[in-house]
Amino acid sequence: MASLADRVRGNGRIAAGLLLNLLVSICIVFLNKWIYVHYGFPNMSLTLVHFVVTWLGLYVCQKLDIFAPKSLPPSKLLLLALSFCGFVVFTNLSLQNNTIGTYQLAKAMTTPVIIVIQTLCYKKTFSTKIRLTLIPITLGVILNSYYDVKFNFLGTVFAALGVLVTSLYQVWVGAKQHELQVNSMQLLYYQAPMSSAMLLVAVPFFEPVFAEGGIFGPWSVSALLMVLLSGVIAFMVNLSIYWIIGNTSPVTYNMFGHFKFCITLFGGYVLFKDPLSINQGLGMLCTLFGILAYTHFKLSEQEGSKSKLVQRP
C-alpha cells in the first residue's frame, strides 16, 4: 500500500509539473504578445528583464539547494551567452512582428536547421527517415507564411534570424554541456548574468533608455507589473522544463511539447483574432505531421541504440 501511495504521489507531482509547464509556456507567448501590442514595451529591454529575473531566480534556487552551481571559466561561455541574447531577442522580435501562428510555425524550422548545421559542421549523419520528415515541416511553414494575410517582410527576416540563432544556440548548448560536464541549470546560472551584461551595454544603442518608450521611461503601473510578471513566468518556464526533463521520459517531454504547440496555435487565433485561411490550416497540419513523425523516428532510433548497448557483451 505504501508503494502504491508513493506512486500516486509521484504521478501527482509529475502531473502538477506538466500542468505548470503547460500554463507558463503558453502564458509567456500570449503575455509577451500582449505587452508588445498594448504597451509597446521595447523588445531588447524586455529580454534584459527576463535575463535578470531568471538569474535572480536561479540564485535563489541554488541557495535552496535545488541545484549545485559549478565553477565555469567565463571565456568558454562568451559565444554561448552572445547567442543566448540573439536567440531570445530575435524570437521575441518575430513574435512582435508576426501573427502567433506564423511565429509558432517558424520555430518548427529549428529542427531542420539544426540537422543541417550538425551535418555540415559536425559531420553527424541522420537516417533517411529523419531527413524525409523535414519535407512536411518545411512545406507546412512555407504554406502558412505564403497564405498569411498579415505576412510582412520584416517579420519574416526576424523569424529567419531567430531560427538560425536558436539552432546555433541549441547545438552549442549540447556541446558545452558535454564539454564542461554541467546540466542546463548550471549552464544557465552563468549564461544569464553574462547575457544580461551584454544586453545592458547594447540596449542604449538600439532603444531609448530614459525617454518615452524606453525601459526607464514613464510607464503605467499596469505595464510595469505585466513586464515583471513576464520575467517571472520566463524563469518558471526554464525551471519547469528542467524539472520535466529530470523527472519524465523523453517521450513524455516531446509529446507534451506537441500538445503545447497545438494549444498555442489555437489560443493565438482566439485571443488575438488572427485570420486563418484553409491553406494556412493545411500548412499547420503538414508541419505538425512532420514534427510528430520526426519525434517518432528519433525516439525509436534512440531506443534501438540503448537496446544494442544493453545486449552488447
From Swiss-Prot:
Membrane topology field: Multi-pass membrane protein
One GO MF term attached to the UniProt entry: nucleotide-sugar transmembrane transporter activity
Position of the signal peptide: none
GO cellular component, one term: Golgi apparatus
Superkingdom of the organism of origin: Eukaryota
Principal subcellular localisation of the protein: membrane
Keywords: Membrane, Transmembrane, Transmembrane helix
Transmembrane segments: 17-37, 40-60, 77-97, 100-120, 130-147, 153-173, 187-206, 225-245, 252-272, 275-295
Cellular localization per UniProt: Membrane
Keyword Thylakoid: no
GO biological process, one term: transmembrane transport
Keyword Membrane carried by entry: yes
Function according to Swiss-Prot or TrEMBL: Putative transporter.
UniProt similarity note: Belongs to the TPT transporter family. SLC35E subfamily.
Protein name (Swiss-Prot/TrEMBL): Solute carrier family 35 member E3
Organism: Bos taurus (Bovine)
Lineage: Eukaryota, Metazoa, Chordata, Craniata, Vertebrata
